């Protein structure tokens, strides 16, 4: 049985494109494979931003203060597939997701610095990025403004996750026709996806 960690970050709990696509993805896997899904909703259960207390706790090995970070890292290692939902906010990701990233990007836990450069420790995992974007960012004048997809891929690669599938609905806020076309493409992509 494959284990999936389903991470949600959209502040729109209803009418969220990324949440709808994420739900469709999980439903697809449940209907075609034996899977166990754990959900981490970063809006309903927000992760504390790192701060001076967090840095001091790391320096002093204060496990009480690091408990949340340790739990989030444990979830990464326990699951085979990490499905991350992210709408694009201000050309990037929601702050809730950034806080999660800051809590899992911990040297000697999810990556090491070696003589040959950084080495990711979260190996043999697959990631699925479930992205939504109000505009078209894959081409044209807005392309250089997309700090969402490449950032998430870079983070995942850095910690050792190199098998990454991107499911992206673009232009969902432009007009109904573009939105519908994009959602149909995503629907087909999900149908063709296996784990």
UniProtKB/Swiss-Prot annotation:
Keywords: Flavoprotein, FMN, NAD, Oxidoreductase. Gene3D superfamilies: 3.40.50.360. One of its GO terms (molecular function) is electron transfer activity. FMN binds at residues 10, 16-18, 88-91. InterPro entries: Flavodoxin_fold (IPR003680), Flavoprotein-like_sf (IPR029039), FMN-dep_NADH:Q_OxRdtase_AzoR1 (IPR050104), NADH:quinone_OxRdtase_FMN_depd (IPR023048). Binds 1 FMN per subunit. It comes from the Bacteria. Disulfide bonds: none annotated. It is an enzyme of class 1 (oxidoreductase). It catalyses: 2 a quinone + NADH + H(+) = 2 a 1,4-benzosemiquinone + NAD(+); N,N-dimethyl-1,4-phenylenediamine + anthranilate + 2 NAD(+) = 2-(4-dimethylaminophenyl)diazenylbenzoate + 2 NADH + 2 H(+). Its EC number is 1.6.5.-, 1.7.1.17. Its cofactor is FMN. Quinone reductase that provides resistance to thiol-specific stress caused by electrophilic quinones. Belongs to the azoreductase type 1 family. PANTHER family: FMN-DEPENDENT NADH-AZOREDUCTASE 1, FMN-DEPENDENT NADH:QUINONE OXIDOREDUCTASE. Homodimer. This is FMN-dependent NADH:quinone oxidoreductase. It comes from Francisella philomiragia subsp. philomiragia (strain ATCC 25017 / CCUG 19701 / FSC 153 / O#319-036). The lineage of its organism: Bacteria, Pseudomonadati, Pseudomonadota, Gammaproteobacteria, Thiotrichales. The gene is azoR.
């Amino acid at each position: 049985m494959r284990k999936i960690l389903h991470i949600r970050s959209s502040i729109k709990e209803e009418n969220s494109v990324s949440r709808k696509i994420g739900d469709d993805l999980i439903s697809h896997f449940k209907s075609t494979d034996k899977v166990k899904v754990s959900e981490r909703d970063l809006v309903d259960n927000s992760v504390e931003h790192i701060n001076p207390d967090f840095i001091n706790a790391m320096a002093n090995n204060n496990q009480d203060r690091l408990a949340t970070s340790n739990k989030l890292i444990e979830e990464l290692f326990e699951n085979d597939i990490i499905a991350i939902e992210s709408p694009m906010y201000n050309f990037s990701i929601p702050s809730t997701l950034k806080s999660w990233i800051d809590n899992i990007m911990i040297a000697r836990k999810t990556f090491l610095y070696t003589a040959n450069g950084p080495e990711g420790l979260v190996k043999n995992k697959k990631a699925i990025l479930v992205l939504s974007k109000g505009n078209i960012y894959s081409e044209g004048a807005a392309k250089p403004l997309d700090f969402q997809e490449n950032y998430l891929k870079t983070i995942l690669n850095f910690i050792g996750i190199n098998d990454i599938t991107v499911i992206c609905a673009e232009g969902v806020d432009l007009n109904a026709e573009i939105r519908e076309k994009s959602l149909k493409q995503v629907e087909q992509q999900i149908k063709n996806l296996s784990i």
